[in-house]
Amino acid sequence: MKVIFTQDVKGKGKKGEVKEVPVGYANNFLLKKNYAVEATPGNLKQLELQKKRAKQERQQEIEDAKALKETLSNIEVEVSAKTGEGGKLFGSVSTKQIAEALKTQHDIKIDKRKMDLPNGIHSLGYTNVPVKLDKEVEGTIRVHTVEQ
């Protein structure tokens, strides 16, 4: 019997997959527990529509990420920090501070965990901070660190 998996079933199939399984297994386990539906022409057509919609949504996410990358390349974020002698910072500028400054100055919300800045910024001046906007799209934020 051909079934369409509605959930991942370990060792048997993943969600959205169409597979041939024994009739007893399908009727007594998969269909009964709503892990799968029978692969009728109507259900197959519905599956194709869902896959097409998911692909369009994914494409839209990529387009949005590319637009955000373009926006980020044209702006600069200014972050102020306390400094000591010789322009050395007390502590460092973190991704949290950069995300907050980006939100207040340009009304752009980016999760601090998407910024690749493992040790923070330890000096005054300009720094380019890489940002993972999507699995396929990566941009940079230009951060200007100034004295407080």
Curated annotation (Swiss-Prot):
Domain of life: Bacteria
Single GO molecular function: structural constituent of ribosome
Keyword Ribosomal protein: yes
Protein keywords: Ribonucleoprotein, Ribosomal protein, RNA-binding, rRNA-binding
GO CC terms, sorted: ribonucleoprotein complex; ribosome
Upper taxonomic lineage: Bacteria, Bacillati, Bacillota, Bacilli, Bacillales
Disulfide pairings: none
Protein name: Large ribosomal subunit protein bL9
Task of the protein: Binds to the 23S rRNA.
Similarity comment: Belongs to the bacterial ribosomal protein bL9 family.
